[in-house]
Amino acid sequence: MSTIRDVAKLANVSVATVSRVLNHSLSVSENTRLVVEQAIAQLAYQPNANAQALAVQNTDTIGVVVTDVTDAFFAILVKAVDKVAEAHQKTILIGIGYHHAEKEREAINTLLRKRCSSLVVHSKALSDDELSHYLNTVQGMVIINRVIKGYEHRCVSLDNQKGTYLATEMLIRYGHQHIAYIGSNHAIFDEVERRNGYLAALKDHNYPIIEQAITLNSPDFEGGEKAMIDLLSYNKNLTAVVAYNDSMAAGAISVLNENNISVPSQFSIIGFDDMPIARYLIPKLTTIRYPIDLMATYAAKLALSLTDEKIITPPVVQFNPTLVRRFSVESR
């Protein structure tokens, strides 16, 4: 594992200069700061930054790392953590990862340097090994929406596979014979689990798996539009789709409307997450509820309990998805 001396050697500066960069000293020139930060990133240097932060903890602050604050899913997550923080007379600091390992690492390290004693981290790009290292180093860190082996008691997760299984099975029971799946093109565990749930339901009901009925794109409105266009181009018999999330479902519905394909009388669709948009689409979207508000509340309480013995540790649970029936599904 890299040390501060390794960073100094690679950057061709003194150990004291590296220390000043880590402490955001104004006495360091911008060029020197950039060279040192590049060396830190290249060596994946973390331990001393963590140790420095942990040596003088600030128990009044909870750090939150999310992927994108413009996404309603993460806005709900942050709001839930903030409510817990407020109830315990604390404040929150937010770091953003943008689906990039370097950004996630930088966000976590920055929050640690800001002396956050508790962290709620939503990480999709960092490896299990690196997150294990953080969990081993940072007593008050909790992972949300992911499970790290050996630290299951500090991870808050959802059974994603069960969610898409429920969605696909509903369409099967409504008589649909040709069901597609619109997934995320991000290489994350959520996508693997949700696709596996769709495939498992087809297999359990003896439905054939058609490769052309599975398409991946960016997990947003535009990605849903592009994915639906691809599906309509390759498959003329499709009557239903399970979408990775509500945003992709909304994009898909837009394409169906543009092609004069009525939802749900001609085509059924089920989303995932139950974000506010699901209630305002036309028709209102049948979806799988992801209880991120409850999960984030639990994660924040767990993170606080790990650093404050006066706060009772909540019981460990894996949250379950539920089917929310609205008006985007109809029998065949």
From Swiss-Prot:
Keywords: Carbohydrate metabolism, DNA-binding, Galactose metabolism, Repressor, Transcription, Transcription regulation. PANTHER family: HTH-TYPE TRANSCRIPTIONAL REGULATOR GALS, LACI-RELATED TRANSCRIPTIONAL REPRESSOR. Residues 4-23 bind DNA. Residues 1-56 form the HTH lacI-type domain. GO terms for biological process: galactose metabolic process; regulation of DNA-templated transcription. Transmembrane segments: none annotated. SUPFAM superfamilies: lambda repressor-like DNA-binding domains, Periplasmic binding protein-like I. This is HTH-type transcriptional regulator GalR. GO terms for molecular function: DNA-binding transcription factor activity; transcription cis-regulatory region binding. Repressor of the galactose operon. Binds galactose as an inducer. It holds the Pfam family LacI. Pathway: Carbohydrate metabolism; galactose metabolism [regulation].
